[in-house]
Design a protein with these regions (language model features):
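Conserved acidic segment of CheY-like receiver
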Residues: 4-16, 21-25, 32, 39
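Hydrophobic/aromatic residues located in beta-strands of well-ordered beta-sheets
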Residues: 8, 30, 108-110
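Acidic, metal-coordinating helix/loop segments flanking the phosphotransfer/catalytic sites
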Residues: 15, 32-50, 54-63, 67-68, ...
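Short, aromatic/basic amphipathic alpha-helical patches
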Residues: 21-25, 121-130
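Short acidic-hydrophobic, aromatic-tinged amphipathic segments that line or gate anion-handling sites
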Residues: 33-34, 133-139
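A short, hydrophobic beta-strand element within the central beta-sheet of small alpha/beta folds
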Residues: 73-125
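C-terminal output helix
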Residues: 117-125, 136-152
């Protein structure tokens, strides 16, 4: 009897990661959702072994973004356009917080973001999400597979 393929939930606002991973990193059973709320629903409904999470969500309607637009607007001197961009540019972190707050902090997450110059930021995030991993934009399929294997071990 063969071992089942790991279930990887891709959370992104486009289809790039789904297309790329299914083509170049075969093996896992991939599923995709396009918002944080949908990610939480998918985690509740099925046995997800790993979340592959995008950082930036700039193709999603404002109503589908997690986070407090009023707080983001205040943070950007009352500019609602900058507040909205803040939510878009950091949506992966808002989704990560949402998953942790709803009891899914033990599910390993690969965040598609380059932390190579932000070691302190990554360290801070790992205090809240110990099973947090990352891959940058210029990653090879072999590197993605290695990070997936590490995250699933």
């Amino acid at each position: 009897m063969s071992e089942r393929a790991p279930r990887v939930l891709i959370v992104e606002d486009g289809d790039e990661y789904l297309r790329t991973l299914t083509r170049f990193v075969p093996g896992p059973d991939y599923a995709q959702v396009k918002s944080g709320v949908a990610a939480l629903d998918a985690l509740r409904a099925a046995g997800v072994d790993l979340v592959y999470l995008d950082m930036r969500f700039d193709r999603v309607p404002l109503g589908d973004l997690l986070g407090d637009l009023d707080a983001a607007t205040r943070r950007h001197n009352g500019d609602p356009a900058r507040g909205w961009r803040h939510l878009q540019n950091h949506q992966g972190l808002f989704i990560l917080d949402h998953l942790v707050a709803n009891g899914f902090g033990d599910v390993p997450v690969i965040l598609a973001y380059d932390f190579s110059r932000e070691a302190r930021r990554l360290e801070f995030l790992r205090r809240r999400v110990p099973r947090l991993y990352w891959v940058g934009d210029a990653v090879t399929p072999e590197e993605v597979l290695a990070v997936m294997k590490e995250a699933l071990s």
